[in-house]
Amino acid sequence: MSSEDIIYDPQFKPVQGIYENRLRQFIDTGGDYHDLNLPKFYDKKRISLDHDHVKVWWYQVSFERGSSPVSPDKRPSWKSIIERDKKGELEFREANINQPFGPSWSTTWFKVKISLPEDWVKSNEQLLFQWDCSNEGIVIDPKTLIPVTAFSGGERTEYVLPKTSDGKHFFYIEAGNNGMFGCGAGSTINPPDDNRFFHLRKADIVWPDLDARALYIDFWMLGDAARELPGDSWQKHQARQLGNAVMNLFDPNDRSSVRKCRELLQREYFDSFLESSKVYEQGESQVLTNVYGIGNCHIDTAWLWPFAETRRKIVRSWSSQCTLMDRFPEYKFVASQAQQFKWLLEDHPEFFNKVLIPKIQQSQFFAVGGTWVENDTNIPSGESLARQFFFGQRFFLKHFGLKSKIFWLPDTFGYSSQMPQLCRLSGIDKFLTQKLSWNNINSFPHSTFNWAGIDGSQLLTHMPPGNTYTADSHFGDVLRTAKQNKTPEYYGSGLMLYGKGDGGGGPTEEMLQKMRRIRSMNNRNGNVIPKLQVGITVDEFYDDILKRTNQGHDLPTWSGELYFEFHRGTYTSQAQTKKLMRLSEIKLHDLEWIAAKTSVLYPDSYKYPSKQINELWENVLLCQFHDVLPGSCIEMVYKYEAVPMLHNVVKECTSLIDKTVQFLQSQSKADLVEMRTLTWSKPEKVSEECSLNGSYTSSVTGYDDYIVLANGKLKVIICKKTGVITSITDETLGVEYLDTEHGRNKLGANQFVIYDDKPLGWQAWDTELYSVNQYKYVTKPKKVQVSCNTKEKCAVEVIFQISEKCKIKSVISLNATAVTDAKLSKVDISTTVENWDARNKFLKVEFPVNIRNDFASYETQFGITKRPTHYNTSWDVAKFEVCHHKFADYSEYSKGVSILNDCKYGFSTHGNLMRLSLLRSPKAPDAHADMGTHEIKYAIYPHRGALSSDTVKLAHEFNYCFKYKLPKDIGMNFDDIISISGDENVILSNIKRGEDDSAVKSNYSLNPRDEQSIVVRVYESLGGESFASLNTTLNLKRIEKVDNLEMKVYKSLTATRDESNHAINRIPIKLRPFEIASFRLYF
């Protein structure tokens, strides 16, 4: 045996945990050994702010404390600042490192002048300017006013300097003094710190070592593979060993060792295309792709910042993405929300036309979604949701020549059961969200599926398995997207949405480089490392789903609403905004109704105000953004933007209606009649004395312990001791509708309850399950007295003192009713909460009813959603608080109770208890949310039999209560222009002029026609096939059933003359359950 056969140097098996943990040291810029590892070589040279090479001056835009932080003067246009500076009108002062800039929400402008060292210029290598002022900023070319790239403190700090022969650079930086997530004090979702300052940390020119920076990405992905791949894969262990081999090979005193390390990794673990877009063309083509990467940039239109700041976030984010597209040909980026595109066009037309439009034409930048904003779908009315698509899709068609095929709504708080139908009516057949991954009780069971609405319409739906729309393109993000797919038996691939989001930003160069490395590792090592594909479009991804699932027929189906098991408090937070939204929707309905009919009667002397109407709709739709209307924004959004905006909508609608009414009154000398905008309401004479002949009159009787209100149909007993309603009986039937003997509430109806409301986090968003059993009844009235006692109306006023400043005044009333309308008799309640000053309390009002059913019915947009009244399963438990619109109904076969309201959305029905949510008092992100005085109207409608069209129509009347005084002859003509007859459950909901009528001159017209038309929207309200007739005196030329966009014609219809009145044309229509239908009538 020779000495060579003797072991002199024994080897040990590496200890996995130790060797794995060691890998983090190599690229750690803040670790103890950063100067002995790769970070030492990230830069070849760096020069910080000095007087020879980098000079920076600053100018602070005037910002008076206490003034509106969203006024235009706080964010002056780029052009105005640069022109004024050129004229010497602005005083720019020299800036210094660590200098603070602020306060919160103010704007600071910087001028940057760079003179690169001669040897840097001669190198002809890529050079950088690195800027970090801890806030948001954007680089602006002073000659073209076109932005180049954006900065966000700590995340996006580098600007690639264009190559120049002399190394000279001059540009401006506009900086908004807020972080990417606003200015929250302590936590991002706390109320803002309005006195926050942002420090200039870096203003450096950098000569980077691109090899070292590339090795940083190589090693990062290799280390992630070592940490995150399954333990039974050889690729995991090889990654760990190679990582340690690289660290052993690296020499901190020899920069050339960087190249040697890269060469080792390319030989052993990556392919040769790891830095090229061609990497996605390599590998086994027969192997199915696990993960498809799509860049996106979710910009909340308002949230922890105002609309005014979002306008700047848009250009910052999208300019950065357009710059990246020039360097990464595979990069595809999607952005939604037509409102954001419109703001960009208004604020930066040069960028919109010269940069954005070409990127769209080159199929790198994609406008998706089809809605005006990424809207809430719980609270907006059905017509509002229809207009979200109408304006969104028409904007895209007008400016980009395309409409979206996908409803893009990754981040909203639940999805209405009518969304599939509204999407299909708007040219959309696909849907993407991921929010249900936030469910806090049940895990949603599907990733790819068909979502069917209550009418049967369905959308091909994908929920990215990575459970985020802001993936950083980490190895783990790709791995989770591949492994967390919940429907792999049907479709085994998933979409990964990568890019900084919520506050904007979007993908970074680093993310795109990481994805190239991950695909390179897959090309070399097989599918234990997921096969990642970048470069396809969202439409191509969905086409792949259809191809691999028998056109979607093999996929599972989810029917009904996509209820979000979280953020249930958003049905109630910011009550004033929700009330103004309801009022705005009603006023717009009335304006379109009266303006459309007036333009038909007087085409030569009255012009339909389409431009004003469209602008008002845009503002309403903007305020339906999924943080604004739900109530989860900071205070300034409501104080300075949304509330004033909605007040203005109501004011402008009222003004336009008044002008139209005055015009109509000038056209006739006939007596005036009062008209509503509901097709079943008939004109009433103005100031006509109420005739009580043939009516049940109202009366009030007082006793020692209680007060009785009665009108011959209903008898209502109010307890003087507690101030609540203890009995509601139908005297004609002998039926009691309340139950005070069983269940939790043995006191009575209109019982106010204050719940503790301390969710686990997310105050404005959440109310939690445990709060259901943590409550106190308000039982000691300060006053109970008769406030009205006439034959027309009787009422009792009840006052409760809640705190030293806060009191509740509730007026319970009963009106006289005609014998023929007695079945519609209801108990009206008007409640004023004065000086609501609670902290983390939730005010509700309860109604214990003598009803038993497993399900209750809640009005949703254009229909009904049924939900359980029991807690059988965890899915039932999760629905302890739900959303409704104008009514909730709880019925059994023989009788039922409907609760109507004029501005509330939260509700629950369990056991025998119906509960309407009134007010919350969260303290973040708005510290003053819902404080103050609130007026709320609701009603108890007891009825015989199950839910019927009586409830639907009463709820409409309860809300659409405005009356307009018109000459009698014109009023009759108004009624005859369009009406509906037939099945009572078919509702004629809206009337408007055709958008493409040339005479209308709409700014959203796409194909102007020299024709006149009105568009009529109807829907089936209760869930049954129905037949009705549209009746009109118009001299009809043709009739079309059209889509929501007024573009696609489904079919043509014919009209017949009414046999008893030949002036009337009757158009027979048939609707399936919960169908929404639009008809365009040409005349």
Curated annotation (Swiss-Prot):
Functional summary from the UniProt entry? Degrades free oligosaccharides in the vacuole.
Endpoints of the signal sequence: none
Q: Which residues form the active site?
A: 411 (nucleophile)
Q: What's a GO biological-process term for it? A: cellular response to glucose starvation
**One Pfam family matching this protein:** Glyco_hydro_38C
What keywords is this UniProt entry annotated with? Acetylation, Glycosidase, Hydrolase, Metal-binding, Vacuole, Zinc
**Which residues get modified to N-acetylserine?**
2
Q: Name one GO molecular function term.
A: metal ion binding
Q: What is noted besides the main data? A: It is not specific for the 1,2-alpha-mannosidic linkage. Present with 319 molecules/cell in log phase SD medium.
* Chain sites annotated for binding Zn(2+): 298, 300, 411, 626
Return the EC number: 3.2.1.24
Q: How is it modified after translation?
A: The N-terminus is blocked.
Record's protein name: Alpha-mannosidase
Instruction: Report the principal subcellular site.
Output: other
**InterPro entries in the record:** Ams1-like_N, Gal_mutarotase_sf_dom, GH38_C, Glyco_hydro/deAcase_b/a-brl, Glyco_hydro_38_C, Glyco_hydro_38_cen, Glyco_hydro_38_cen_sf, Glyco_hydro_38_N
Cofactor: how bound:
Binds 1 zinc ion per subunit.
Subcellular location(s): the record lists: Vacuole
The cofactor(s) it depends on are:
Zn(2+)
Subunit structure, briefly?
Composed of isoforms with three constituent polypeptides described as [(107 kDa)-n (73 kDa)-(6-n) (31 kDa)-(6-n)], where n is 0-6. The 73 kDa and the 31 kDa polypeptides may be proteolytic derivatives of the 107 kDa polypeptide in the vacuole. Oligomerizes in the cytoplasm and retains its oligomeric form during import into the vacuole.
Native source organism of the sequence: Saccharomyces cerevisiae (strain ATCC 204508 / S288c)
Cellular-component GO terms for this entry: Cvt complex; fungal-type vacuole membrane
